[in-house]
Structures are given as structure tokens and as C-alpha cells.
Amino acid sequence: MPNVTIARESPLQDAVVQLIEELDRYLGDLYPAESNHLLDLQTLAKPDIRFLVARRSGTVVGCGAIAIDTEGGYGEVKRMFVQPTARGGQIGRRLLERIEDEARAAGLSALLLETGVYQATRIALYRKQGFADRGPFGPYGPDPLSLFMEKPL
């Protein structure tokens, strides 16, 4: 299996921008605009975001981020994505574990997330990693197309 690395990197690199555009198209095909809660590239580059890039043999194949809410004491998992051609190699699990490490290092007490109900594989990964269903949080309201989850750290 090719070497996979996960590291904090800028989301403003060309290959990462292309990956985020692919993710946006994917989510846009699944959900209406009002149910897509996407952080744009400029927001992903802010200091309160820890943006991670997965590379396989040096090529960008996935990403994930944690938005740190210091007031609430939690981190929100954002922009988790692995290219379809790179799936099946535990990259998503490794990204999520690295996000958890970043959250612990930042002194956060929990990770929260919002994901779409049509993403069964992603939901299964979150549950396998210890996330449990919860109600809306932060800026979110009830949405029949959203699932909200939490994992204490």
C-alpha cells in the first residue's frame, strides 16, 4: 500500500482547492443549498481552523478540519472528504483520529459535527469512532437532511 501521510497544511494550495471543489460538487448533488453548511477556503485558512491534508505517495487524496470554538470548549469536524479512488484504505479513519488528536492538544472537551443523512458510509465511520447522535448545536437549526453527532474527548 502506498505511503499515506496526514499533516496540517494550508487549504489554499491548488491541489487542495481542487479537492474542496470536488467535495462541493458532491455535496451539491446530494443536498439543496440551505442544507449545505460549508466553510469556504478563506474561512478554512483562519487561525481557529486546523486544516489537515491526507496525501498518498505525495498526492492529495483527502482532507478534514476542526473549527475550534474556544468559548464552547468544543471543536467542530468540517470538510471531511476522501477522493472516491482513495477510499477503502482507512484514510478517513486516520483523518478523523488526527482531528481528535488536534482537538485534545487544543484542550477541547468534545468534538461535534453535522453531516448529511444520505452519507451512510461517513455516518458509519463516525459511529464506529465513538460519535453519538445529538441535537443541533451552535448556528444549526433542525434540518431533516442533517444528522448531528458528538464525541466526548
From Swiss-Prot:
PROSITE patterns: GNAT
Gene Ontology MF terms: acyltransferase activity, transferring groups other than amino-acyl groups
Domain (N-acetyltransferase) ranges: 4-153
Keyword terms of this UniProt record: Acyltransferase, Transferase
Source organism superkingdom: Bacteria
InterPro entries from the UniProt entry: Acyl_CoA_acyltransferase (IPR016181), Bact_Acetyltransf (IPR050832), GNAT_dom (IPR000182)
A Pfam family: Acetyltransf_1
EC number: 2.3.1.-
Role, per record: Participates in the tryptophan-dependent indole-3-acetic acid production, which is a phytohormone released by A.brasilense.
Name of the protein: IAA acetyltransferase
Organism: Azospirillum brasilense
